[in-house]
């Protein structure tokens, strides 16, 4: 049985979020949470929140045992990009891309 959780339209670049998600893929829940507790990245609180949501879904919706849960899938997809402009010298403007991410985590019993 699998339990899923996701966060869509999160305002962080997918490349940065993938660095954190790659650390917890395939790990047991306790180990994944301890890794996230000591990871100093901007995406860590977002990934931790999604992981805790997947754990809560597994416990509440499917009556799974938390001690046996493993992160089976963890991936980040690219969301829509917000385009902004920054004024530059001589009346020009340059574009700034504010990227968004969709974070997905799937946990299951081993």
Curated annotation (Swiss-Prot):
Single GO MF annotation: structural constituent of ribosome
Annotated keywords: Ribonucleoprotein, Ribosomal protein, RNA-binding, rRNA-binding
Pfam annotation, one family: Ribosomal_L22
InterPro entries assigned to the protein according to its UniProt record, in alphabetical order: Ribosomal_uL22, Ribosomal_uL22_bac/chlpt-type, Ribosomal_uL22_bac/org-type, Ribosomal_uL22_CS, Ribosomal_uL22_sf
Entry GO terms, CC: cytosolic large ribosomal subunit
SUPFAM superfamilies, alphabetized: Ribosomal protein L22
Gene3D superfamilies linked: Ribosomal protein L22/L17 (3.90.470.10)
Stated role: This protein binds specifically to 23S rRNA; its binding is stimulated by other ribosomal proteins, e.g. L4, L17, and L20. It is important during the early stages of 50S assembly. It makes multiple contacts with different domains of the 23S rRNA in the assembled 50S subunit and ribosome.
Similarity comment text for this entry: Belongs to the universal ribosomal protein uL22 family.
HAMAP family: Ribosomal_uL22_B (MF_01331_B)
Protein name, per record: Large ribosomal subunit protein uL22
């Amino acid at each position: 049985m699998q339990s899923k959780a996701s966060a869509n339209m999160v305002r962080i670049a997918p490349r940065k979020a993938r660095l954190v998600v790659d650390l917890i893929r395939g790990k047991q829940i306790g180990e994944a949470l301890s890794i996230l507790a000591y990871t100093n990245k901007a995406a860590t609180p977002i990934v931790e929140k999604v992981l805790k949501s997947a754990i809560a879904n597994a416990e509440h919706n499917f009556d799974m045992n938390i001690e046996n849960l493993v992160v089976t899938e963890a991936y980040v997809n690219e969301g829509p990009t917000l385009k902004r402009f920054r004024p530059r010298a001589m009346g020009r403007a340059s574009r700034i891309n504010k990227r968004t991410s969709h974070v997905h985590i799937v946990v299951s019993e081993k």
